[in-house]
Amino acid sequence: MTKLLATRSARIIHPSLALLLGAAAATLTLPAMAGDTSAAQQLERWSAQAGTPGNAEQGRDFFNARHGGEWSCSSCHGNPPVKSGEHASTGKDIAPLAPAFNARAFSDTAHIDKWFRRNCNDVLERECSTAEKANVLAYLIGLKP
C-alpha cells in the first residue's frame, strides 16, 4: 500500500513538478529585454512615420547639439552614450542609451515615448519629430562595442 501511494504521489507530483521546471527553464532562456519592441522595430516605426530612413550622421549631430539651449542629449547620456550617464540637474544615474551596451534600451514602447517626450522638451522645448527620433536611433544602433 505504501508503495502504491508513493507511486500515485509521484504521478500526481510529477506533472506539477514538470510544469514548474519547464516554466523555470523557459524563464531562463528569455532575452534580457522584457518589453514589447526592439530598437530595430522602433527605428522602422519612426522611419516609416517620417517617410525617410534614419540617418546616423544626422542623429549624431542632433544628439550632441545644444539646439540653442543649455543642454544636449549628450549632457546627460554622455558622448558617446555607451556608458552610464548622469542627469545634468538631478545627478540621477542613467543607463547606457546605445542598444549594444544596454539590452533593455528601446525595448518598451510606452517607456520610449514617455522619455523622448520629456527629454525632447528639456533639450528642445518641444517634442522631437519622428525624423529626429529615427536619426538619433540610427546613430545609437550604429554604436558597437
For each feature predicted by the language model, list its residue ranges:
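N-terminal signal peptide c-region/cleavage motif recognized by signal peptidases
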Residues: 29-31
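Short microdomains enriched in Cys/His and/or Lys/Arg
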Residues: 94-110
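Short cysteine/histidine-rich zinc-coordinating motifs and their immediately flanking basic loops
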Residues: 85-92
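N-terminal secretory signal peptides that target proteins for export/translocation
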Residues: 1-12
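The canonical Cys-X-X-Cys-His
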Residues: 68-80, 136
